[in-house]
């Protein structure tokens, strides 16, 4: 348990930041899941629309430090490849 005033404040800050990060990570995963569900259903138009909305969310998560930049790029790249394969 935190004893000093500064340690107590840091505990509060960490809890607040954790909640924000959890929300951002969940939002990113939701957008990714929408793309994957559209791909699984075989609907190319819906998948493309979902991908266009998911890409900025994934990159925003990387800018906020939720995921690494390369991880975000890899996720976008793989989703894009799957959507393109669906259209072909």
UniProtKB/Swiss-Prot annotation:
GO MF annotation list: small ribosomal subunit rRNA binding; structural constituent of ribosome
Keywords per UniProt: Ribonucleoprotein, Ribosomal protein, RNA-binding, rRNA-binding
Domain of life: Bacteria
Cystine connections: none
GO CC entries: cytosol; small ribosomal subunit
SUPFAM superfamilies: Ribosomal protein S20
HAMAP family the record matches: Ribosomal_bS20
Cross-referenced NCBIfam families: S20
Protein name as catalogued: Small ribosomal subunit protein bS20
Organism: Methylobacterium sp. (strain 4-46)
Gene, per the UniProt record: rpsT
């Amino acid at each position: 348990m935190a004893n000093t005033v500064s340690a107590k404040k840091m505990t509060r800050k960490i809890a607040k930041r954790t909640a924000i990060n959890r929300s951002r990570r969940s939002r990113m995963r939701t957008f990714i899941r929408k793309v994957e569900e559209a791909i699984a259903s075989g609907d190319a138009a819906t998948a493309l629309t979902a991908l266009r909305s998911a890409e900025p969310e994934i990159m925003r998560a990387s800018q906020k430090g939720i995921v690494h930049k390369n991880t975000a790029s890899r996720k976008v790249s793989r989703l894009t490849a799957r959507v393109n394969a669906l259209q072909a």
